[in-house]
Amino acid sequence: MEKLYALFGCPVHHSLSPIMHNDAFQNMNIAAHYHAFHVEPERLKDAIAGVRALGISGVNVTIPHKTAVMPLLDEVDPTARRIGAVNTIVNRNGRLIGYNTDGPGYVRALEEEINVDIKEKRILLIGAGGAARGIYVSLADRGAKQIDICNRTVSKAKQLIDECNASVSSVVYSLNEAEERLGEYDILINTTSVGMYPNMEEMPLSLANMKEETIVSDIIYNPLETKWLKEARKRNGIIQNGVGMFVYQGALAFEKWTGIFPDVQRMKKIVIEQLRG
C-alpha cells in the first residue's frame, strides 16, 4: 500500500516540497506520495489527530506551526527541543516523534556546497527568529568558535542565546554595531526575509566593511541571488543562497522517514528549475 507523507502549514500553496519529495520517491521506487495540506492554527490539533487516525507516515511542519506542534507529539528529539521548533514528524507505529532538520540541513549545505570546516570559525548571524535558532544551535554543535547575533530587537537576540543554551561564545550587536565589525567574521549569515521577493531591493546589512573571501550566506532562495549576495560577489565574497538549506532539510527529513538518504543533486536541480519557472 502506498504510504502518505504530508506538509502542514499556513499557507502552503507556494511550497516546492511536494514536487521535490514526490520526485525522490519515484526516483527511488518508493511507493509513497507527499501532499501539502493548508492547516489553520486552530486546526493543528485536529490535523495531528488525523496523522494518528489515518496512519500518515511522516509530516513536514512549516510556518506557523513549528513550535505549536511540539506539545502535541509523543516525543521530541533533544536537538529540536533546544531549538524550540519541530519541522519533521516521524510516525513510528503510532508514536509521533518530532525532529528539527532545518539547522542541521543548513550546516550540511554550508559544509558541502562551500567545502568549509565550521570548527574555529567566527560567525555573524543576522536575525533572531525561528530559522536563526536552528542555525545557531547546529553551528554551535559543529564547534564554531564565536557566533554573534545582530538583530533589530536586541532583546530578542539575547533571549535566543539564553534559551538555546549552546556551548559557544556569543555577543549581541545592533545592526549598526555589526556593520562596523564585519571584518572580524569568517561567515555572515542572513536568516531574515529581508531581500526576499517581492522586496528585492532591500539588504539586511551593509557589506562596506566586509573582508575579501568572507563566506556570505543567505537562506532566501527567491530570488536565487539576492541583492545582498550580488553585493558580496562584487566584494570578492564566497556566496551561498538558500536552495541548499531547503534541499538538505528536506533530504534529512526524507532520511528520517525512509532510512534512505536521497539524491540531493537531483533535488537541487528540481528546485532550481521550479524557481526559474
From Swiss-Prot:
What is catalyzed by this enzyme? shikimate + NADP(+) = 3-dehydroshikimate + NADPH + H(+)
Q: Where are the active-site residues found?
A: 66
Q: Which UniProt keywords apply?
A: Amino-acid biosynthesis, Aromatic amino acid biosynthesis, NADP, Oxidoreductase
Amino-acid positions noted as binding shikimate in the UniProt annotation, renumbered to this chain: 15-17, 62, 87, 102, 221
Record carries keyword NADP: yes
- Matches recorded under CDD domains: NAD_bind_Shikimate_DH
Q: Superkingdom of the source?
A: Bacteria
User: Can you quote a single GO CC term?
Assistant: cytosol
What are the recorded Gene Ontology BP terms? amino acid biosynthetic process; aromatic amino acid family biosynthetic process; chorismate biosynthetic process; shikimate metabolic process
Q: Which Pfam families match?
A: SDH_C, Shikimate_DH, Shikimate_dh_N
Q: Give the EC number(s) listed in the UniProt record.
A: 1.1.1.25
**InterPro entries attached to this UniProt entry:** Aminoacid_DH-like_N_sf, NAD(P)-bd_dom_sf, SDH_C, Shikimate_DH, Shikimate_DH-bd_N, Shikimate_DH_fam, Shikm_DH/Glu-tRNA_Rdtase
Q: Which pathway does the UniProt entry assign to this protein? A: Metabolic intermediate biosynthesis; chorismate biosynthesis; chorismate from D-erythrose 4-phosphate and phosphoenolpyruvate: step 4/7
Gene Ontology molecular function: any one? shikimate 3-dehydrogenase (NADP+) activity
Q: Which residues bind NADP(+)?
A: 127-131, 151-156, 219, 242
Primary role: Involved in the biosynthesis of the chorismate, which leads to the biosynthesis of aromatic amino acids. Catalyzes the reversible NADPH linked reduction of 3-dehydroshikimate (DHSA) to yield shikimate (SA).
Complex formation: Homodimer.
Family in the record = Belongs to the shikimate dehydrogenase family.
Q: What is this protein called?
A: Shikimate dehydrogenase (NADP(+))
Record gene name: aroE
